[in-house]
Protein backbone atom coordinates (compact mmCIF):
# COMPACT_ATOMS: atom_id res chain seq x y z
CA UNK A 1 0.00 0.00 0.00
CA UNK A 2 2.76 2.43 0.88
CA UNK A 3 4.56 1.70 -2.39
CA UNK A 4 1.41 2.33 -4.43
CA UNK A 5 0.70 5.59 -2.64
CA UNK A 6 4.24 6.74 -3.36
CA UNK A 7 3.85 5.99 -7.06
CA UNK A 8 0.60 7.98 -7.27
CA UNK A 9 2.27 10.91 -5.51
CA UNK A 10 5.22 10.87 -7.90
CA UNK A 11 2.85 10.72 -10.92
CA UNK A 12 0.87 13.75 -9.76
CA UNK A 13 3.91 16.01 -9.38
CA UNK A 14 4.54 16.48 -13.16
CA UNK A 15 0.87 17.38 -13.71
CA UNK A 16 1.05 20.11 -11.06
CA UNK A 17 4.19 21.52 -12.68
CA UNK A 18 2.46 21.64 -16.09
CA UNK A 19 -0.50 23.52 -14.64
CA UNK A 20 1.79 26.02 -13.02
CA UNK A 21 3.74 26.56 -16.23
CA UNK A 22 0.74 28.15 -18.19
CA UNK A 23 0.90 31.89 -17.46
CA UNK A 24 -2.04 34.19 -16.76
CA UNK A 25 -3.32 36.98 -19.05
CA UNK A 26 -1.77 40.33 -18.19
CA UNK A 27 -2.85 44.02 -18.12
CA UNK A 28 -6.61 43.71 -18.10
CA UNK A 29 -8.04 46.98 -19.50
CA UNK A 30 -11.56 48.25 -20.17
CA UNK A 31 -12.35 50.36 -23.25
CA UNK A 32 -15.61 52.15 -22.52
CA UNK A 33 -17.80 54.87 -23.97
CA UNK A 34 -21.17 55.58 -22.38
CA UNK A 35 -22.64 52.03 -22.15
CA UNK A 36 -20.26 50.28 -24.54
CA UNK A 37 -17.71 48.09 -22.70
CA UNK A 38 -14.85 46.07 -24.17
CA UNK A 39 -12.36 44.10 -21.99
CA UNK A 40 -8.83 43.66 -23.40
CA UNK A 41 -5.68 41.95 -22.09
CA UNK A 42 -2.12 41.12 -23.11
CA UNK A 43 -0.75 37.69 -23.93
CA UNK A 44 2.72 36.50 -24.90
CA UNK A 45 2.27 34.25 -27.95
CA UNK A 46 5.81 32.87 -27.69
CA UNK A 47 4.96 30.83 -24.60
CA UNK A 48 2.29 28.55 -26.07
CA UNK A 49 2.05 29.46 -29.76
CA UNK A 50 -1.29 30.00 -31.48
CA UNK A 51 -3.20 27.17 -29.79
CA UNK A 52 -4.17 29.19 -26.70
CA UNK A 53 -7.79 30.29 -26.07
CA UNK A 54 -9.43 32.50 -23.44
CA UNK A 55 -12.60 32.49 -21.37
CA UNK A 56 -14.25 35.61 -19.84
CA UNK A 57 -16.87 35.58 -17.07
CA UNK A 58 -18.51 38.21 -14.83
CA UNK A 59 -20.59 38.35 -11.65
CA UNK A 60 -22.09 41.05 -9.44
CA UNK A 61 -19.65 41.98 -6.70
CA UNK A 62 -22.12 41.54 -3.85
CA UNK A 63 -22.43 37.83 -4.78
CA UNK A 64 -18.76 37.23 -4.07
CA UNK A 65 -19.58 36.75 -0.39
CA UNK A 66 -22.02 33.96 -1.10
CA UNK A 67 -20.98 30.33 -0.76
CA UNK A 68 -22.37 29.42 -4.15
CA UNK A 69 -21.00 31.70 -6.80
CA UNK A 70 -22.89 31.85 -10.10
CA UNK A 71 -20.62 33.29 -12.82
CA UNK A 72 -22.01 34.48 -16.16
CA UNK A 73 -19.86 33.48 -19.12
CA UNK A 74 -19.49 36.04 -21.93
CA UNK A 75 -16.67 34.77 -24.16
CA UNK A 76 -15.65 31.09 -24.23
CA UNK A 77 -12.54 29.66 -25.91
CA UNK A 78 -11.94 32.77 -28.00
CA UNK A 79 -8.54 33.22 -29.63
CA UNK A 80 -8.72 37.01 -29.58
CA UNK A 81 -7.35 39.07 -26.71
CA UNK A 82 -10.57 41.05 -26.26
CA UNK A 83 -14.17 40.46 -25.26
CA UNK A 84 -17.19 42.73 -25.85
CA UNK A 85 -19.41 43.08 -22.78
CA UNK A 86 -21.85 45.59 -24.30
CA UNK A 87 -24.61 43.06 -24.82
CA UNK A 88 -24.33 41.64 -21.28
CA UNK A 89 -26.88 44.16 -19.94
CA UNK A 90 -24.68 45.44 -17.12
CA UNK A 91 -26.47 47.96 -14.94
CA UNK A 92 -24.86 51.40 -15.16
CA UNK A 93 -24.83 51.88 -11.36
CA UNK A 94 -23.88 48.29 -10.52
CA UNK A 95 -20.48 46.90 -9.48
CA UNK A 96 -19.13 43.78 -11.11
CA UNK A 97 -16.13 41.46 -11.05
CA UNK A 98 -14.67 40.36 -14.38
CA UNK A 99 -12.25 37.45 -14.74
CA UNK A 100 -10.20 35.94 -17.58
CA UNK A 101 -8.16 32.72 -17.92
CA UNK A 102 -6.13 31.08 -20.69
CA UNK A 103 -6.37 27.48 -21.92
CA UNK A 104 -3.92 25.46 -24.04
CA UNK A 105 -3.77 21.71 -24.73
CA UNK A 106 -6.28 20.95 -22.01
CA UNK A 107 -4.37 23.00 -19.41
CA UNK A 108 -5.97 26.10 -17.84
CA UNK A 109 -4.24 29.07 -16.25
CA UNK A 110 -5.36 30.79 -13.08
CA UNK A 111 -8.20 33.33 -13.24
CA UNK A 112 -7.35 37.03 -13.32
CA UNK A 113 -10.01 39.30 -11.77
CA UNK A 114 -10.87 42.97 -12.37
CA UNK A 115 -13.48 45.13 -10.67
CA UNK A 116 -15.71 47.26 -12.86
CA UNK A 117 -18.38 49.88 -12.11
CA UNK A 118 -19.81 51.64 -15.21
CA UNK A 119 -20.86 54.71 -13.25
CA UNK A 120 -17.28 55.22 -12.09
CA UNK A 121 -15.12 53.64 -14.80
CA UNK A 122 -17.09 54.16 -18.03
CA UNK A 123 -16.06 57.15 -20.15
CA UNK A 124 -18.56 59.85 -21.06
CA UNK A 125 -19.14 60.64 -24.71
CA UNK A 126 -19.64 64.07 -26.36
CA UNK A 127 -23.04 65.27 -27.60
CA UNK A 128 -24.34 63.15 -30.43
CA UNK A 129 -25.28 66.20 -32.54
CA UNK A 130 -24.90 70.00 -32.46
CA UNK A 131 -26.89 72.46 -34.61
CA UNK A 132 -26.49 76.24 -34.93
CA UNK A 133 -29.20 78.69 -36.02
CA UNK A 134 -28.96 82.51 -36.26
CA UNK A 135 -31.59 84.55 -34.39
CA UNK A 136 -30.97 88.18 -35.23
CA UNK A 137 -27.53 89.04 -33.91
CA UNK A 138 -27.54 85.94 -31.64
CA UNK A 139 -27.01 82.21 -32.17
CA UNK A 140 -29.18 79.35 -30.94
CA UNK A 141 -27.28 76.14 -30.16
CA UNK A 142 -29.27 72.89 -30.15
CA UNK A 143 -27.49 70.07 -28.29
CA UNK A 144 -28.44 66.39 -28.55
CA UNK A 145 -27.55 64.20 -25.55
CA UNK A 146 -24.95 61.42 -25.75
CA UNK A 147 -26.59 58.10 -26.60
CA UNK A 148 -26.33 54.66 -25.06
CA UNK A 149 -25.81 51.43 -26.98
CA UNK A 150 -29.61 51.17 -27.24
CA UNK A 151 -29.95 54.75 -28.60
CA UNK A 152 -31.29 56.26 -25.38
CA UNK A 153 -30.17 59.48 -23.71
CA UNK A 154 -27.31 59.22 -21.23
CA UNK A 155 -29.23 61.55 -18.93
CA UNK A 156 -31.25 58.48 -17.94
CA UNK A 157 -28.09 57.18 -16.21
CA UNK A 158 -26.23 60.43 -15.46
CA UNK A 159 -28.69 62.81 -13.86
CA UNK A 160 -26.31 65.74 -13.40
CA UNK A 161 -24.96 65.77 -16.91
CA UNK A 162 -24.27 69.25 -18.34
CA UNK A 163 -22.40 70.84 -21.24
CA UNK A 164 -19.52 73.26 -21.54
CA UNK A 165 -19.75 75.50 -24.61
CA UNK A 166 -16.71 77.27 -26.08
CA UNK A 167 -17.37 79.94 -28.71
CA UNK A 168 -15.27 82.63 -30.36
CA UNK A 169 -15.29 85.05 -33.29
CA UNK A 170 -13.64 83.60 -36.34
CA UNK A 171 -12.42 86.98 -37.54
CA UNK A 172 -10.90 88.05 -34.19
CA UNK A 173 -9.60 84.65 -33.04
CA UNK A 174 -9.27 82.25 -36.00
CA UNK A 175 -7.55 79.54 -33.92
CA UNK A 176 -9.93 79.78 -30.98
CA UNK A 177 -7.13 80.46 -28.49
CA UNK A 178 -9.23 82.75 -26.28
CA UNK A 179 -12.78 81.43 -26.43
CA UNK A 180 -15.68 82.41 -24.25
CA UNK A 181 -17.04 79.70 -21.91
CA UNK A 182 -20.68 78.95 -21.16
CA UNK A 183 -21.96 76.01 -19.05
CA UNK A 184 -25.53 74.80 -19.37
CA UNK A 185 -27.55 71.64 -18.75
CA UNK A 186 -30.22 72.67 -21.29
CA UNK A 187 -30.42 71.26 -24.76
CA UNK A 188 -31.18 74.69 -26.29
CA UNK A 189 -28.74 77.48 -25.48
CA UNK A 190 -28.62 81.04 -26.86
CA UNK A 191 -25.15 82.53 -27.04
CA UNK A 192 -25.15 86.10 -25.67
CA UNK A 193 -23.12 89.23 -26.50
CA UNK A 194 -22.60 88.56 -30.19
CA UNK A 195 -22.10 91.04 -32.99
CA UNK A 196 -24.30 91.25 -36.07
CA UNK A 197 -23.05 89.84 -39.36
CA UNK A 198 -20.13 88.07 -37.69
CA UNK A 199 -18.96 84.48 -37.96
CA UNK A 200 -18.75 82.50 -34.68
CA UNK A 201 -17.41 79.00 -34.07
CA UNK A 202 -18.67 76.62 -31.35
CA UNK A 203 -17.30 73.48 -29.62
CA UNK A 204 -19.18 71.54 -26.89
CA UNK A 205 -18.09 69.07 -24.19
CA UNK A 206 -20.14 66.74 -21.95
CA UNK A 207 -19.29 66.90 -18.22
CA UNK A 208 -20.15 65.00 -15.01
CA UNK A 209 -18.52 66.54 -11.97
CA UNK A 210 -19.43 63.90 -9.37
CA UNK A 211 -16.84 61.46 -10.71
CA UNK A 212 -14.94 64.17 -12.59
CA UNK A 213 -15.92 62.85 -16.02
CA UNK A 214 -15.36 64.93 -19.14
CA UNK A 215 -15.79 63.99 -22.77
CA UNK A 216 -13.87 65.15 -25.79
CA UNK A 217 -15.01 68.32 -27.58
CA UNK A 218 -17.07 68.18 -30.73
CA UNK A 219 -15.70 69.39 -34.03
CA UNK A 220 -15.87 73.19 -34.43
CA UNK A 221 -18.99 74.43 -36.19
CA UNK A 222 -19.28 77.99 -37.49
CA UNK A 223 -22.31 80.16 -38.30
CA UNK A 224 -22.82 83.83 -39.19
CA UNK A 225 -25.14 85.98 -37.13
CA UNK A 226 -27.74 88.24 -38.71
CA UNK A 227 -29.10 91.69 -37.94
CA UNK A 228 -30.62 94.81 -39.46
CA UNK A 229 -29.74 95.09 -43.12
CA UNK A 230 -27.81 98.31 -43.96
CA UNK A 231 -29.43 100.75 -46.39
CA UNK A 232 -26.49 100.53 -48.75
CA UNK A 233 -26.89 96.78 -48.96
CA UNK A 234 -30.63 97.15 -49.60
CA UNK A 235 -29.93 99.60 -52.44
CA UNK A 236 -27.33 97.25 -53.88
CA UNK A 237 -29.79 94.35 -53.84
CA UNK A 238 -32.42 96.54 -55.53
CA UNK A 239 -29.97 97.66 -58.21
CA UNK A 240 -28.85 94.13 -58.94
CA UNK A 241 -32.46 92.91 -59.15
CA UNK A 242 -33.35 95.73 -61.57
CA UNK A 243 -30.40 94.88 -63.79
CA UNK A 244 -31.37 91.23 -63.82
CA UNK A 245 -34.98 92.07 -64.71
CA UNK A 246 -33.84 94.42 -67.49
CA UNK A 247 -31.59 91.77 -68.97
CA UNK A 248 -34.37 89.21 -68.83
CA UNK A 249 -36.81 91.55 -70.59
CA UNK A 250 -34.19 92.46 -73.19
CA UNK A 251 -33.35 88.86 -73.93
CA UNK A 252 -37.02 87.93 -74.11
CA UNK A 253 -37.75 90.77 -76.54
CA UNK A 254 -34.79 89.85 -78.72
CA UNK A 255 -35.83 86.20 -78.80
CA UNK A 256 -39.42 87.14 -79.70
CA UNK A 257 -38.19 89.48 -82.46
CA UNK A 258 -35.97 86.78 -83.94
CA UNK A 259 -38.79 84.26 -83.80
CA UNK A 260 -41.27 86.68 -85.41
CA UNK A 261 -38.79 87.62 -88.14
CA UNK A 262 -38.03 83.99 -88.94
CA UNK A 263 -41.74 83.15 -89.02
CA UNK A 264 -42.48 86.09 -91.29
CA UNK A 265 -39.64 85.27 -93.69
CA UNK A 266 -40.84 81.67 -93.84
CA UNK A 267 -44.52 82.27 -94.61
CA UNK A 268 -44.36 85.79 -96.11
CA UNK A 269 -41.03 86.13 -97.91
CA UNK A 270 -40.03 89.55 -99.20
CA UNK A 271 -38.94 88.14 -102.57
CA UNK A 272 -42.02 86.87 -104.46
CA UNK A 273 -42.00 84.27 -107.19
CA UNK A 274 -42.65 85.46 -110.74
CA UNK A 275 -46.25 85.52 -111.89
CA UNK A 276 -45.78 82.85 -114.58
CA UNK A 277 -44.48 80.45 -111.87
CA UNK A 278 -47.12 81.31 -109.28
CA UNK A 279 -49.94 80.55 -111.72
CA UNK A 280 -48.71 76.95 -111.93
CA UNK A 281 -48.15 76.62 -108.15
CA UNK A 282 -51.47 78.09 -107.01
CA UNK A 283 -55.04 77.01 -107.56
CA UNK A 284 -56.65 78.33 -110.72
CA UNK A 285 -59.88 79.27 -108.94
CA UNK A 286 -60.24 83.02 -108.39
CA UNK A 287 -59.19 84.29 -104.96
CA UNK A 288 -57.54 81.01 -103.95
CA UNK A 289 -53.97 80.95 -102.57
CA UNK A 290 -53.82 77.22 -102.00
CA UNK A 291 -50.77 75.66 -103.66
CA UNK A 292 -51.39 73.29 -106.48
CA UNK A 293 -48.20 71.28 -106.05
CA UNK A 294 -50.12 67.98 -106.12
CA UNK A 295 -52.43 67.47 -109.08
CA UNK A 296 -55.88 66.11 -108.33
CA UNK A 297 -56.69 62.64 -109.56
CA UNK A 298 -59.63 63.95 -111.62
CA UNK A 299 -57.45 66.24 -113.70
CA UNK A 300 -56.35 64.85 -117.03
CA UNK A 301 -52.69 64.56 -117.72
CA UNK A 302 -51.39 67.19 -120.14
CA UNK A 303 -49.01 66.04 -122.84
CA UNK A 304 -46.84 68.56 -124.60
CA UNK A 305 -44.83 68.18 -127.75
CA UNK A 306 -41.72 70.14 -128.38
CA UNK A 307 -41.96 72.47 -131.37
CA UNK A 308 -38.92 74.23 -132.71
CA UNK A 309 -39.28 77.29 -134.97
CA UNK A 310 -36.27 78.28 -137.00
CA UNK A 311 -36.07 81.35 -139.26
CA UNK A 312 -35.81 80.89 -143.03
CA UNK A 313 -32.49 81.95 -144.38
CA UNK A 314 -32.86 84.38 -147.28
CA UNK A 315 -29.89 85.08 -149.44
CA UNK A 316 -29.77 88.63 -150.69
CA UNK A 317 -28.02 89.29 -153.94
CA UNK A 318 -27.02 92.83 -154.69
CA UNK A 319 -25.71 93.70 -158.11
CA UNK A 320 -23.82 96.93 -158.35
CA UNK A 321 -23.93 98.41 -161.87
CA UNK A 322 -20.73 99.69 -163.32
CA UNK A 323 -20.11 103.38 -163.01
CA UNK A 324 -21.41 105.50 -165.81
CA UNK A 325 -18.90 107.42 -167.80
CA UNK A 326 -20.94 110.46 -168.49
CA UNK A 327 -24.67 110.71 -168.01
CA UNK A 328 -26.53 112.85 -170.58
CA UNK A 329 -26.87 116.48 -169.80
CA UNK A 330 -30.60 116.40 -170.01
CA UNK A 331 -30.67 113.82 -167.29
CA UNK A 332 -28.80 115.97 -164.78
CA UNK A 333 -31.91 117.55 -163.39
CA UNK A 334 -33.74 114.20 -163.24
CA UNK A 335 -30.76 112.58 -161.55
CA UNK A 336 -30.58 115.26 -158.87
CA UNK A 337 -34.32 115.02 -158.35
CA UNK A 338 -34.09 111.21 -158.02
CA UNK A 339 -31.29 111.54 -155.49
CA UNK A 340 -33.33 113.92 -153.34
CA UNK A 341 -36.40 111.70 -153.60
CA UNK A 342 -34.51 108.54 -152.64
CA UNK A 343 -32.90 110.32 -149.72
CA UNK A 344 -36.29 111.47 -148.49
CA UNK A 345 -37.71 107.97 -148.69
CA UNK A 346 -34.86 106.37 -146.77
CA UNK A 347 -34.62 109.14 -144.20
CA UNK A 348 -30.86 109.54 -144.77
CA UNK A 349 -29.26 112.41 -146.61
CA UNK A 350 -25.82 112.15 -148.07
CA UNK A 351 -23.25 114.83 -147.60
CA UNK A 352 -22.53 115.08 -151.24
CA UNK A 353 -26.18 115.39 -152.16
CA UNK A 354 -26.63 118.17 -149.64
CA UNK A 355 -23.63 119.97 -150.92
CA UNK A 356 -24.91 119.54 -154.47
CA UNK A 357 -28.23 121.07 -153.53
CA UNK A 358 -26.51 123.91 -151.79
CA UNK A 359 -24.38 124.38 -154.84
CA UNK A 360 -27.44 124.33 -157.08
CA UNK A 361 -29.31 126.70 -154.87
CA UNK A 362 -26.34 128.94 -154.94
CA UNK A 363 -26.26 128.80 -158.69
CA UNK A 364 -22.89 127.01 -158.93
CA UNK A 365 -22.51 124.38 -161.70
CA UNK A 366 -22.23 120.72 -160.73
CA UNK A 367 -19.80 118.53 -162.45
CA UNK A 368 -20.65 115.11 -163.81
CA UNK A 369 -18.01 113.36 -161.71
CA UNK A 370 -19.52 114.66 -158.52
CA UNK A 371 -22.98 113.47 -159.58
CA UNK A 372 -21.70 109.97 -160.25
CA UNK A 373 -20.00 109.81 -156.86
CA UNK A 374 -23.16 110.98 -155.11
CA UNK A 375 -25.21 108.29 -156.79
CA UNK A 376 -22.77 105.54 -155.81
CA UNK A 377 -22.66 106.76 -152.22
CA UNK A 378 -26.46 106.71 -152.01
CA UNK A 379 -26.61 103.11 -153.26
CA UNK A 380 -24.01 102.06 -150.69
CA UNK A 381 -26.00 103.64 -147.84
CA UNK A 382 -29.12 101.78 -148.96
CA UNK A 383 -27.30 98.45 -148.96
CA UNK A 384 -25.94 99.05 -145.42
CA UNK A 385 -29.46 99.87 -144.20
CA UNK A 386 -30.87 96.69 -145.70
CA UNK A 387 -28.05 94.61 -144.16
CA UNK A 388 -28.72 95.96 -140.66
CA UNK A 389 -32.47 95.29 -140.99
CA UNK A 390 -31.84 91.70 -142.07
CA UNK A 391 -29.46 91.18 -139.12
CA UNK A 392 -32.08 92.50 -136.67
CA UNK A 393 -34.76 90.20 -138.12
CA UNK A 394 -32.39 87.22 -137.86
CA UNK A 395 -31.70 87.95 -134.18
CA UNK A 396 -35.40 88.22 -133.42
CA UNK A 397 -36.28 84.97 -135.21
CA UNK A 398 -33.58 82.92 -133.46
CA UNK A 399 -34.77 80.79 -130.47
CA UNK A 400 -36.97 77.85 -129.56
CA UNK A 401 -40.58 78.19 -128.53
CA UNK A 402 -42.52 75.39 -126.78
CA UNK A 403 -46.20 75.26 -127.57
CA UNK A 404 -48.61 73.01 -125.65
CA UNK A 405 -51.13 71.26 -127.89
Swiss-Prot record:
Matching InterPro entries: FN3_dom, FN3_sf, Ig-like_fold, Interferon/interleukin_rcp_dom, Type-II_Cytokine-TF_Rcpt
Predominant location: membrane
PROSITE patterns per record: FN3
Gene Ontology cellular component list: plasma membrane
Protein name: Interferon alpha/beta receptor 1a
Phylogenetic classification of the source organism: Eukaryota, Metazoa, Chordata, Craniata, Vertebrata
GO molecular function: interferon receptor activity
Biological function: Together with IFNAR2, forms the heterodimeric receptor for type I interferons (including interferons alpha, beta, epsilon, omega and kappa). Type I interferon binding activates the JAK-STAT signaling cascade, resulting in transcriptional activation or repression of interferon-regulated genes that encode the effectors of the interferon response. Mechanistically, type I interferon-binding brings the IFNAR1 and IFNAR2 subunits into close proximity with one another, driving their associated Janus kinases (JAKs) (TYK2 bound to IFNAR1 and JAK1 bound to IFNAR2) to cross-phosphorylate one another.
Induction statement: In the fibroblastic RTG-2 cell line, induced by polyinosine-polycytidylic acid (poly(I:C)), a synthetic analog of dsRNA, that binds TLR3.
Subcellular location field: Cell membrane
Disulfide cysteine pairs (residue numbers): 75-83, 201-222
Amino acid sequence: MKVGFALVLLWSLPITNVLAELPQPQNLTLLTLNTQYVLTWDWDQTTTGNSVSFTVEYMAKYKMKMKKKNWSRVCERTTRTRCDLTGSDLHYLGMYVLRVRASADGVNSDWVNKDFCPDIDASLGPPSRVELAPVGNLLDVTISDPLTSTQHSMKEHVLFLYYRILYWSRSDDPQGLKPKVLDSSNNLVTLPELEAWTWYCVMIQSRYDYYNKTSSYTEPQCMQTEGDTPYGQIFLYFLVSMMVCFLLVLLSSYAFFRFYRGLKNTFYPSIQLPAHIQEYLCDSSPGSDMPRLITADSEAELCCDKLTICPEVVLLEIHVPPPLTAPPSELEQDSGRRIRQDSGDSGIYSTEGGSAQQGRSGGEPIRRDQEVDSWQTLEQVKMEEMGRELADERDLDEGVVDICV
